[in-house]
Amino acid sequence: MSKIFSILATFSMGTALLPAAPPSNSQPLTEKAWMNLEQGVTNKRAGKRVNAVHALRLLPHDPRAQKMAEKALADSNAKVRAAAARALGPMGAESSVPKLEAALDDKEPAVVFAAAHSLFVLGHPEDAYEIDYEVLIGERKGADGLVASQLNELKDSKAMAMMGVETGVGFVPFGGPAYEAFKRISTDRTSPVRAAAAKELAADHDSKIDAALAKAYSDKKWAVRAAAVFAIAKRDNPAFLKVITPALDDKNDIVRYEASATVLRLSAGQAAQQASTARQPANENMAAAGK
């Protein structure tokens, strides 16, 4: 873990930490965050819709986010539908199972596999196994389309960078055959490694990691900023709310959407902590009265 920390810290040196300031229009944080995501999922550009829907995965058991993802399952663009199907699993959207099962009949293989994966995550492995079986014996038509869609992603530098953000240090393409393809596409050799390092540190609660992530989130490379925000979300520490507030206005839409989902996630956690703290005196008084 110390090696991963040194990678992140070394490349983050000299990067100034952005000031912890509220959004420019003084909107409440959560209102600003929801507005960003709403604008993203309804954007006329499919790429932005994909990025906004993808960010929803950071909001588990959130009815509003779940409704947004479910609506995206019916998007006219297959990449948006696939992003929605992938997001619903990590969101713990058990009530979305019927909609995910319906998505198994989508004409685009990428959507089908995304839905099958989420069903597996949600505790319905039989659906995923059925899809895999049909592909194996050749009954599932259009399976080649999934391969084609993956090859198309190799031509998309942002998609490749996000693959690094999502899967960590041991991720494909940087640990497998696709690495050579990536090198032909991108001239940036360090950002993916730094992004992976940031994500890998998500579960390490050392205070030094907090400082490194706070610094990395203001990095000049968007992939590093996005990875740092993702790691901050996974740490579930409301103390980071003030730190990542400026990212709600990040010029990169991926960072902006990830930060918006992170603000909502941490705000919900903060509210839960405050409610729990408020209940403690009452519980103690009741216990004392019962003695």
Question: What name fits each language-model region?
Answer:
Residues G145-M160, F174-R189:
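Acidic, Ser/Thr- and Gly/Pro-rich intrinsically disordered linkers and low-complexity segments
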Residues A52, A84, A115-A116, V147, ...:
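Conserved hydrophobic register position within alpha-solenoid helical repeats
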Residues K44-R45, S76-N77, K107-E108, E139-R140, ...:
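Short inter-helical turns and helix N-cap capping residues of alpha-solenoid HEAT/ARM repeat scaffolds
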Residues S6-A16:
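Bacterial N-terminal signal peptides
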Residues R49, R81, V112-F113, D144, ...:
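Residue-level detector of extended alpha-helical repeat arrays and alpha-solenoid scaffolds
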Residues Q27-G40, H61-A74, A93-D105, H124-I137, ...:
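Amphipathic alpha-helical scaffolding segments comprising HEAT/armadillo-like alpha-solenoid repeats
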Residues T42-R86:
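N-terminal, post-signal-peptide region of Sec/Tat-exported proteins
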